[in-house]
Amino acid sequence: MKSYEVNFDGLVGPTHNYGGLSYGNVASQSNSQQSSNPKEAALQGLAKMKALMEMGFQQGVLAPQERPDVAALRRLGFSGTDAQVIERAAKEAMPLLVASCSASSMWVANAATVSPSADTADGRVHFTAANLNCKYHRSIEHPTTSRVLGAMFANQQHFAHHAALPAVAQFGDEGAANHTRFCREYGDAGVEFFVFGRSAFDTRYPAPQKYPARQTLEASQAVARLHGLRDDGVVYAQQNPAVIDQGVFHNDVIAVGNGEVLFYHEDAFLDTDQMLAELQAKLAKVGGKFQSVCVPRSAVTVDDAVRSYLFNSQLLSRPDGSMLLIVPEECRGNERVWNYLQGLTSSGGLIREVKVFDLKQSMQNGGGPACLRLRVALNETELAAVNPGVIMTAPLYGSLTAWVEKHYRDRLTESDLADPQLLLECRTALDELTQILKLGAVYPFQIN
């Protein structure tokens, strides 16, 4: 049976703004309080989805969340009508209103960790929503994330959904941004690669000094247990704490994997040789030939990697067995990075082509091509069981672009977030979106 890797891209929400909420994310902090363009952001994301679909890749879409999150503000003590809650929050605690308006759910690499059926004990595709407890504005996402994923992957014969891990620092979980999977073919048993920043309970592991390590070893281990993964099918690796302190807040800012290939920076991990040997040995047990492509610091510095998002790219398999790298425009703007990529694609290796996309609106908030997508490996039967409304087609692209043009503002500043009309605009838009994507009632305003 044929199998596919389907990229489900996050649709940018109508409240996309530069709130500077993500400590440790250099782009997010450096662009704080600039005016944003939600319409342009959503259209840029949709253009990437359409392009990949037209290249023959399986492409889906993941709906944004309801923002402002009035229920979250009510839990923090603001009361009255919805409009009064927003007005009070703007007057008394603007940072909380900004957090409740964040469109950060567009970076669906953080939505969940996904294990395909070939890896799991019960032969189903498993999803665990990420608790994202390191940042308040993201910690409020997982209930809606779980409902949306449940509406997309509803068939319990094929799909299993787990609630987010306990929302405490010891089980900080950032989802697929710290997880990748190596395999020969997408339908074959593979090796799941979990990258953590620190251990919550074992003091032998070092930790960063400046920025927080958002993923714990214990969270990764818990997800592997929930998904019923074999010990032989899992590798845990620690991200280098020094690069976390340089702005590498998720592993997908310093490494990307696909198929049998890991593309990574020389400084990405601790105990790299041991990690590579374990990946090679475990992948060999399931018939795979592990390959690594190391980018030396002499060619591309960590700072170059963070500024260009070279590794926050999509590494995609083509029918001829070669690979394509999807990178943001910022890579072309960095001379060292661009020179490295030209050399890489002409060297005769597996990565033979680079395609560049303009994702500036997302990039300025610290999210590149890899942040915007959640990878789900599915066989033909499982793909047929996915809600067809979320699979990208030319008609769906047309419907979604028209929907964005109709509902989204082309400029949003911090002061605009206090406008109660914005809440009404967003709810009207999302109500229509659930009909377009055939999701049913997934948002709090539709349920309560």
UniProtKB/Swiss-Prot annotation:
Lineage top rank: taxon: Bacteria
Catalytic residue list: E174, H250, C371 (nucleophile)
First-level EC class = hydrolase
Q: Name one GO biological process term.
A: arginine catabolic process to succinate
- What Pfam families does this protein map onto? AstB (PF04996)
Q: Which residues form the signal peptide?
A: none
Where are the bilayer-spanning segments?
Answer: none
Catalytic activity entry = N(2)-succinyl-L-arginine + 2 H2O + 2 H(+) = N(2)-succinyl-L-ornithine + 2 NH4(+) + CO2
Q: Which family does it belong to?
A: Belongs to the succinylarginine dihydrolase family.
Complexes and interactors:
Homodimer.
Q: What is this protein called?
A: N-succinylarginine dihydrolase
Organism of origin is Pseudomonas fluorescens (strain Pf0-1)
Q: Which gene encodes it?
A: astB
